[in-house]
A protein has these predicted regions:
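Membrane topogenic/interface segments and analogous intrinsically disordered interaction regions
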Residues: 1-186
């Protein structure tokens, strides 16, 4: 093989990689715009565990923002997080389409279960956080509030929107990644 043929093969691989990355990026941007349109609904969904815990507690709570741009930036963050969460299977499929032509048939068959299980396990980790961990964690942390004694001030939660949603998104991401452990270990 001549040097020019090697360079041609290398350039074609880079071109294919570029095409796959551009498809992934365009898909992510499209879903980001869609998610931004529905950002308030997504925000409501992510805040629901907090709202339910507060309602069960019987206290009058709210989420606050302390900077003028905080709500806007929170909607941007929520939209990007949701778009990334939704497009992850598509991005993995693009990576697969780039890698698959270089694999033998038996290698493709061996990897296929992992490709299917990866997004499923990530989604299950996110569901565990949303439906089980967050409600329990919120109730646990709210139990540390105090009414104050005659000599001390009460400790009361004034949760910031951005901090709460950052916690929820970090936990969803962390549990989604930790649910990948069976794939990594096998």
């Amino acid at each position: 093989m001549s040097n020019e043929e090697n360079e041609g093969g290398f350039v074609s691989h880079l071109t294919e990689l570029r095409k796959r990355l551009i498809h992934s990026f365009i898909f992510l941007i499209i879903f980001f715009v869609i998610c931004y349109i529905f950002a308030e609904h997504i925000y409501g969904f992510l805040v629901d565990p907090f709202a339910q815990a507060v309602k069960d507690d019987g206290s009058d709570r709210r989420l606050i923002f302390t900077a003028l741009q905080e709500t806007f930036l929170t909607y941007i963050k929520v939209s990007f997080f949701t778009a990334f969460f939704v497009t992850c299977p598509f991005i993995l499929m693009q990576i697969w389409k780039f890698i698959a032509p270089g694999l033998y048939k038996h290698e493709k068959v061996a990897i296929l279960p992992y490709l299917i299980l990866t997004p499923v396990l990530f989604f299950l980790g996110g569901m565990l956080v949303y439906y089980l961990i967050m409600p329990l964690a919120i109730k646990f942390f709210l139990s540390f509030e105090s009414t104050g004694m005659s000599t001390s001030l009460p400790i009361q939660l004034e949760a910031k929107v951005n901090e709460y949603l950052s916690l929820v998104m970090k936990l969803i991401f962390a549990f989604g990644i930790s649910f990948q452990l069976p794939i990594v270990l096998s």
